[in-house]
Amino acid sequence: MGAFFRDEVAGPLGADFHIGLPESEDARVAELIPPVIDMANQEFDPNSIAGRTLLSCLIDATEPRTREWRGAEIPAAGGTGNARSVARVHSALACGGTVDGVRLMSPETVERVLEQQSDGQDLVLELGVRFGMGFGLWLEDWIMSPNPRHFFWGGYGGSIALVDLDTRMSLAYVMNRMDSELTGDTRGKSIVKALYDSTR
């Protein structure tokens, strides 16, 4: 998976993002600072679906500091990069599949991301969510953009990736100091707000 991503996506886009970081790049990595309240210390009912899910596979927030983690090719959770590289990869989606002359997919494929796959209560996050193909979609409670044709997702610690098809913008926020929230933190949300405030 790492070689495919490097050869077909990151390389052609010039994105400094890796799924399976080569050991030669370790010195460039800024260490993550674990959240004040880590997952094990969150107040979950251990018998709830959220508790059984999140507490059954705890990841020590210091684990990404290890060579084994960095080198592992874990597409859903093990990528290594900076905000610029995450936004660069997502810019291909924001620009209809082609950015700076590099075509990764057709405009029709990009539009398929908006096809709703589910809409309802997420029993782990314990809130309403809508999913398209691989991303969260516009929802009253989760308005990331004033434009309904946007999609997004985030990661443990507070990272955010946002794609807005109407404005052809992508935005990413990644952090070293992890937040304890499961659904994004105020730092990333404030950057999203500032972006849209500046485009009015």
How should these model regions be labeled?
Residues M1-I143:
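Short, surface-exposed loop or secondary-structure junction motifs
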Residues C95, L137, H150, A161-L162:
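Short basic/hydrophobic patches in alpha-helices and adjacent helix-turn junctions
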Residues V129-G132, N147, Y156-G157:
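A generic structural signal for well-ordered coil/turn residues at beta-strand boundaries
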Residues G154-R200:
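Structured C-terminal helix/loop/strand segments within mature extracytoplasmic catalytic/sensor domains
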